[in-house]
Amino acid sequence: MKTKIFCDSADYKSIKKLSNRTLVSGFTTNPSLMRLSGAKNYKNYSLKLLKVCRGKPISLEVFADSFLHMVEQAEKINSWGKNVYVKIPVINSRGNFSGKVIKILCAKDIKLNITAVYTVAQVRKILKTVNRNSKVIISIFAGRMADVGKDPIPIIKDSVRLAKKFKNVKILWASTRDTL
């Protein structure tokens, strides 16, 4: 397994600086980070970030909660660049699995980053939903698990083992706060 490092930020200066470094393989951000970085317009700020990413993958998240609006936003976000991965939460605020959204977007060959994943059961559901062609990142919130005293390492190991059967799926240790 080859380890890749992604920068989790929306800070324009940091992304511009790190885009030139071979150590950083890609970027991931979300609407909250963008707001903290001073973004006033999500699309315009995203396009600004895309200009400095130099073709490296960048994950840009939908902010809709309904599945219909997630699909609509994902299609728009996907159109912004060839290196865009659209971030979709594994569940919406009502706790419903985003499987239909994932299936629709994979059928349209939209690269996805399924985010806010906490369990191996969620990883299994995602893997049953994706096709074997679309590129998919599964972002496991290891840092947040550790924050509440749960060891994320067994979940990461099991998830990597399950994802090895899919050449198009990568596991991302996400929401990092500390080294474990």
Residue ranges and their predicted role:
Residues 110-180:
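Catalytic alpha/beta core domains of metabolic enzymes, predominantly
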